[in-house]
Protein backbone atom coordinates (compact mmCIF):
# COMPACT_ATOMS: atom_id res chain seq x y z
CA UNK A 1 0.00 0.00 0.00
CA UNK A 2 1.05 3.56 -0.69
CA UNK A 3 0.07 6.12 1.92
CA UNK A 4 -1.57 9.00 0.08
CA UNK A 5 -3.62 12.15 0.51
CA UNK A 6 -6.53 13.69 -1.38
CA UNK A 7 -5.91 17.21 -2.66
CA UNK A 8 -9.44 18.19 -1.66
CA UNK A 9 -7.93 18.48 1.81
CA UNK A 10 -5.47 21.11 0.56
CA UNK A 11 -7.86 23.58 -1.12
CA UNK A 12 -5.87 26.67 -0.18
CA UNK A 13 -2.57 25.37 -1.57
CA UNK A 14 -1.41 25.67 -5.15
CA UNK A 15 -1.45 22.17 -6.58
CA UNK A 16 2.31 22.17 -7.12
CA UNK A 17 2.84 23.22 -3.51
CA UNK A 18 0.43 20.55 -2.28
CA UNK A 19 2.31 17.86 -4.19
CA UNK A 20 5.67 19.05 -2.87
CA UNK A 21 4.32 19.16 0.69
CA UNK A 22 2.94 15.64 0.52
CA UNK A 23 6.20 14.28 -0.88
CA UNK A 24 8.22 16.07 1.80
CA UNK A 25 5.97 14.69 4.53
CA UNK A 26 6.50 11.11 3.36
CA UNK A 27 3.37 10.38 1.33
CA UNK A 28 3.72 8.11 -1.69
CA UNK A 29 0.48 8.71 -3.59
CA UNK A 30 -1.86 11.60 -4.40
CA UNK A 31 -5.60 11.56 -5.10
CA UNK A 32 -6.00 14.51 -7.48
CA UNK A 33 -9.44 16.11 -7.15
CA UNK A 34 -10.21 18.02 -10.34
CA UNK A 35 -11.52 21.41 -9.26
CA UNK A 36 -11.47 25.12 -9.97
CA UNK A 37 -7.81 26.08 -10.02
CA UNK A 38 -6.60 22.47 -9.85
CA UNK A 39 -6.55 20.77 -13.25
CA UNK A 40 -9.91 22.32 -14.10
CA UNK A 41 -11.07 20.44 -17.21
CA UNK A 42 -13.13 23.49 -18.20
CA UNK A 43 -10.13 25.81 -18.37
CA UNK A 44 -10.84 28.46 -21.03
CA UNK A 45 -7.36 27.94 -22.47
CA UNK A 46 -6.78 24.30 -23.52
CA UNK A 47 -3.08 24.99 -24.03
CA UNK A 48 -2.80 26.23 -20.44
CA UNK A 49 -4.54 23.10 -19.14
CA UNK A 50 -2.28 20.84 -21.22
CA UNK A 51 0.80 22.60 -19.87
CA UNK A 52 -0.51 22.27 -16.32
CA UNK A 53 -1.17 18.56 -16.80
CA UNK A 54 2.36 18.00 -18.09
CA UNK A 55 3.83 19.95 -15.19
CA UNK A 56 1.79 18.01 -12.62
CA UNK A 57 2.65 14.66 -14.20
CA UNK A 58 6.35 15.54 -14.26
CA UNK A 59 6.24 16.75 -10.66
CA UNK A 60 4.56 13.55 -9.49
CA UNK A 61 7.08 11.48 -11.44
CA UNK A 62 9.99 13.44 -9.99
CA UNK A 63 8.75 12.70 -6.48
CA UNK A 64 7.95 9.06 -7.32
CA UNK A 65 4.29 9.51 -6.37
CA UNK A 66 1.40 7.30 -7.42
CA UNK A 67 -1.80 9.02 -8.50
CA UNK A 68 -5.52 8.62 -9.08
CA UNK A 69 -8.00 11.17 -10.42
CA UNK A 70 -10.95 12.08 -8.20
CA UNK A 71 -14.19 13.61 -9.51
CA UNK A 72 -15.89 14.71 -6.29
CA UNK A 73 -15.47 18.49 -6.57
CA UNK A 74 -18.44 20.17 -4.93
CA UNK A 75 -19.28 23.09 -7.22
CA UNK A 76 -17.33 22.55 -10.42
CA UNK A 77 -20.37 21.70 -12.57
CA UNK A 78 -22.90 23.92 -10.83
CA UNK A 79 -21.72 26.95 -8.82
CA UNK A 80 -25.04 27.13 -6.97
CA UNK A 81 -25.67 23.50 -5.98
CA UNK A 82 -23.23 20.99 -4.58
CA UNK A 83 -22.57 17.78 -6.54
CA UNK A 84 -24.97 18.72 -9.32
CA UNK A 85 -25.87 17.39 -11.81
CA UNK A 86 -25.22 13.67 -11.38
CA UNK A 87 -25.60 10.43 -13.28
CA UNK A 88 -28.86 9.90 -11.36
CA UNK A 89 -30.55 13.02 -12.73
CA UNK A 90 -33.87 12.15 -14.43
CA UNK A 91 -33.11 14.69 -17.19
CA UNK A 92 -30.87 13.09 -19.87
CA UNK A 93 -29.41 16.49 -20.79
CA UNK A 94 -28.28 17.03 -17.20
CA UNK A 95 -26.88 13.51 -16.96
CA UNK A 96 -24.90 14.29 -20.09
CA UNK A 97 -23.14 17.15 -18.28
CA UNK A 98 -21.80 14.69 -15.69
CA UNK A 99 -20.95 12.15 -18.39
CA UNK A 100 -18.93 14.74 -20.29
CA UNK A 101 -17.09 15.72 -17.11
CA UNK A 102 -16.21 12.10 -16.36
CA UNK A 103 -14.97 11.63 -19.92
CA UNK A 104 -12.78 14.72 -19.51
CA UNK A 105 -11.50 13.25 -16.25
CA UNK A 106 -10.61 10.03 -18.06
CA UNK A 107 -8.67 12.00 -20.67
CA UNK A 108 -6.76 13.84 -17.95
CA UNK A 109 -6.08 10.56 -16.13
CA UNK A 110 -4.53 9.15 -19.27
CA UNK A 111 -2.36 12.24 -19.73
CA UNK A 112 -1.32 12.12 -16.06
CA UNK A 113 -0.49 8.40 -16.19
CA UNK A 114 -3.03 7.91 -13.39
CA UNK A 115 -3.99 4.50 -12.06
CA UNK A 116 -7.77 5.09 -12.08
CA UNK A 117 -10.62 7.59 -12.08
CA UNK A 118 -12.79 7.53 -8.96
CA UNK A 119 -16.49 8.41 -9.22
CA UNK A 120 -19.87 7.97 -7.51
CA UNK A 121 -23.58 7.87 -8.36
CA UNK A 122 -25.00 10.99 -6.80
CA UNK A 123 -28.33 11.08 -4.99
CA UNK A 124 -31.56 9.79 -6.50
CA UNK A 125 -34.55 12.09 -6.82
CA UNK A 126 -37.52 11.41 -4.56
CA UNK A 127 -39.66 8.53 -5.75
CA UNK A 128 -36.95 6.78 -7.77
CA UNK A 129 -37.40 3.02 -7.38
CA UNK A 130 -34.49 0.63 -6.90
CA UNK A 131 -34.76 -1.07 -10.30
CA UNK A 132 -35.41 2.23 -12.08
CA UNK A 133 -32.41 3.83 -10.41
CA UNK A 134 -30.08 0.96 -11.21
CA UNK A 135 -31.13 0.92 -14.85
CA UNK A 136 -30.73 4.69 -15.17
CA UNK A 137 -27.29 4.61 -13.59
CA UNK A 138 -26.06 1.61 -15.58
CA UNK A 139 -27.25 3.26 -18.78
CA UNK A 140 -25.58 6.55 -17.88
CA UNK A 141 -22.31 4.76 -17.17
CA UNK A 142 -22.30 3.11 -20.60
CA UNK A 143 -20.71 5.99 -22.56
CA UNK A 144 -18.32 6.68 -19.69
CA UNK A 145 -17.10 3.10 -19.65
CA UNK A 146 -16.78 3.08 -23.42
CA UNK A 147 -14.55 6.15 -23.17
CA UNK A 148 -12.55 4.56 -20.34
CA UNK A 149 -12.01 1.50 -22.52
CA UNK A 150 -10.78 3.63 -25.42
CA UNK A 151 -8.30 5.36 -23.10
CA UNK A 152 -7.36 2.27 -21.09
CA UNK A 153 -8.28 3.87 -17.75
CA UNK A 154 -9.97 1.84 -14.96
CA UNK A 155 -12.95 3.31 -13.12
CA UNK A 156 -13.21 2.96 -9.34
CA UNK A 157 -16.79 3.42 -8.16
CA UNK A 158 -17.34 4.66 -4.61
CA UNK A 159 -20.41 3.81 -2.52
CA UNK A 160 -21.26 7.02 -0.67
CA UNK A 161 -23.70 7.56 2.24
CA UNK A 162 -26.64 9.63 1.08
CA UNK A 163 -26.15 8.72 -2.58
CA UNK A 164 -28.08 6.12 -4.56
CA UNK A 165 -25.22 3.63 -4.42
CA UNK A 166 -24.41 3.81 -0.74
CA UNK A 167 -23.61 0.21 0.23
CA UNK A 168 -21.73 -2.77 -1.13
CA UNK A 169 -25.08 -4.51 -1.69
CA UNK A 170 -26.26 -1.73 -3.98
CA UNK A 171 -22.88 -1.69 -5.72
CA UNK A 172 -23.31 -5.42 -6.35
CA UNK A 173 -26.66 -4.74 -8.02
CA UNK A 174 -25.04 -2.14 -10.27
CA UNK A 175 -22.06 -4.36 -10.96
CA UNK A 176 -24.36 -7.14 -12.19
CA UNK A 177 -25.66 -4.76 -14.84
CA UNK A 178 -22.25 -3.33 -15.78
CA UNK A 179 -19.99 -6.41 -15.90
CA UNK A 180 -17.00 -4.59 -17.33
CA UNK A 181 -13.33 -5.43 -16.66
CA UNK A 182 -12.49 -1.74 -16.09
CA UNK A 183 -15.26 -1.24 -13.51
CA UNK A 184 -14.05 -1.68 -9.93
CA UNK A 185 -14.31 -0.15 -6.47
CA UNK A 186 -13.16 2.80 -4.46
CA UNK A 187 -13.59 1.75 -0.83
CA UNK A 188 -13.88 4.55 1.70
CA UNK A 189 -13.07 3.01 5.08
CA UNK A 190 -15.07 5.62 6.98
CA UNK A 191 -18.12 5.06 4.79
CA UNK A 192 -18.02 1.33 5.48
CA UNK A 193 -17.90 2.01 9.22
CA UNK A 194 -20.68 4.58 8.92
CA UNK A 195 -23.26 2.63 6.97
CA UNK A 196 -22.48 -1.08 6.67
CA UNK A 197 -23.09 -3.84 9.21
CA UNK A 198 -20.32 -6.20 10.27
CA UNK A 199 -16.59 -5.72 10.57
CA UNK A 200 -14.87 -3.46 8.05
CA UNK A 201 -12.14 -6.06 7.62
CA UNK A 202 -14.68 -8.68 6.53
CA UNK A 203 -16.00 -6.37 3.81
CA UNK A 204 -12.44 -5.72 2.65
CA UNK A 205 -11.82 -9.46 2.37
CA UNK A 206 -15.06 -9.98 0.44
CA UNK A 207 -14.33 -7.26 -2.09
CA UNK A 208 -10.54 -7.44 -2.07
CA UNK A 209 -9.97 -8.37 -5.73
CA UNK A 210 -12.19 -5.47 -6.84
CA UNK A 211 -10.60 -2.73 -4.74
CA UNK A 212 -8.85 -0.26 -7.04
CA UNK A 213 -8.64 2.78 -4.73
CA UNK A 214 -9.00 3.41 -0.99
CA UNK A 215 -10.03 6.50 1.01
CA UNK A 216 -9.32 6.56 4.72
CA UNK A 217 -10.26 8.76 7.66
CA UNK A 218 -11.90 8.28 11.04
CA UNK A 219 -15.69 8.22 11.42
CA UNK A 220 -18.49 7.25 13.78
CA UNK A 221 -21.22 4.71 13.10
CA UNK A 222 -24.22 6.33 11.45
CA UNK A 223 -22.64 9.78 11.08
CA UNK A 224 -21.15 10.71 7.70
CA UNK A 225 -18.50 13.13 8.95
CA UNK A 226 -14.85 12.70 7.92
CA UNK A 227 -12.85 12.98 11.15
CA UNK A 228 -9.20 13.25 12.07
CA UNK A 229 -7.73 9.93 13.17
CA UNK A 230 -8.47 9.26 16.82
CA UNK A 231 -11.66 11.33 16.83
CA UNK A 232 -13.94 8.56 15.56
CA UNK A 233 -14.54 4.92 16.50
CA UNK A 234 -12.72 2.92 13.80
CA UNK A 235 -10.28 0.21 14.90
CA UNK A 236 -7.69 0.61 12.16
CA UNK A 237 -5.17 -2.24 12.63
CA UNK A 238 -7.58 -5.02 11.53
CA UNK A 239 -8.64 -2.95 8.51
CA UNK A 240 -5.09 -2.34 7.34
CA UNK A 241 -4.24 -5.98 7.98
CA UNK A 242 -7.17 -7.05 5.79
CA UNK A 243 -6.05 -4.74 2.98
CA UNK A 244 -2.58 -6.28 3.16
CA UNK A 245 -4.10 -9.77 3.29
CA UNK A 246 -6.01 -9.27 0.03
CA UNK A 247 -2.87 -7.95 -1.64
CA UNK A 248 -3.97 -4.36 -2.07
CA UNK A 249 -1.03 -2.31 -3.36
CA UNK A 250 -2.70 0.92 -4.44
CA UNK A 251 -3.08 4.26 -2.74
CA UNK A 252 -4.43 4.59 0.79
CA UNK A 253 -5.66 8.17 0.43
CA UNK A 254 -6.51 10.25 3.47
CA UNK A 255 -9.70 12.20 2.76
CA UNK A 256 -10.20 15.18 5.05
CA UNK A 257 -11.79 17.75 2.76
CA UNK A 258 -13.10 19.86 5.64
CA UNK A 259 -9.68 20.25 7.24
CA UNK A 260 -8.25 22.59 4.61
CA UNK A 261 -8.03 25.50 7.06
CA UNK A 262 -5.41 23.48 8.96
CA UNK A 263 -4.15 21.37 6.08
CA UNK A 264 -0.48 21.13 7.03
CA UNK A 265 -1.35 19.99 10.54
CA UNK A 266 -3.86 17.47 9.12
CA UNK A 267 -1.26 16.12 6.68
CA UNK A 268 1.26 15.64 9.48
CA UNK A 269 -1.15 14.22 12.04
CA UNK A 270 -2.56 11.75 9.53
CA UNK A 271 0.87 10.41 8.62
CA UNK A 272 1.93 10.27 12.27
CA UNK A 273 -1.11 8.09 12.99
CA UNK A 274 -1.00 5.81 9.96
CA UNK A 275 2.72 5.37 9.29
CA UNK A 276 3.41 3.16 12.35
CA UNK A 277 0.41 0.98 11.49
CA UNK A 278 1.81 0.53 7.98
CA UNK A 279 5.33 -0.19 9.19
CA UNK A 280 6.65 3.05 7.68
CA UNK A 281 9.55 4.97 9.14
Residues covered by each model-derived region:
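Conserved, mostly hydrophobic/aromatic
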Residues: 5, 22, 30, 60, ...
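Short, acidic/polar
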Residues: 12-22, 99-107, 197-204
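Active-site acidic/histidine proton-transfer and metal-coordination neighborhood
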Residues: 16-17, 61-65, 76-184, 264
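Acidic/histidine-rich catalytic cores of soluble enzymes
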Residues: 2, 19, 29-30, 132-134, ...
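Catalytic domains of carbohydrate-active enzymes, especially glycoside hydrolases
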Residues: 18-36, 113
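Active-site beta-loop-alpha junctions enriched in small/polar residues
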Residues: 6-10, 35-37, 72-74, 122-124, ...
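C-terminal helical cap(s) of enzyme catalytic domains, especially alpha/beta-barrels
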Residues: 263-281
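Glycine-rich, proline-tolerant flexible connector loops at the mouths of alpha/beta enzymes
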Residues: 33-56, 121, 125
Amino acid sequence: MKLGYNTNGLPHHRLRDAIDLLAEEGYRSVALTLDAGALDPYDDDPAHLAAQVRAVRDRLDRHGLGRVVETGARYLLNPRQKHDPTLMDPDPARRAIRQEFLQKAIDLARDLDAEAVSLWSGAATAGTGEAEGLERLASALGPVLAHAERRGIPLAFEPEPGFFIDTFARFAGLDERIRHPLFDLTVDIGHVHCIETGAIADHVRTWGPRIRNVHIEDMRVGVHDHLMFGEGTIDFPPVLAALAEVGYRGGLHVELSRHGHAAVEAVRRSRAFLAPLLGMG
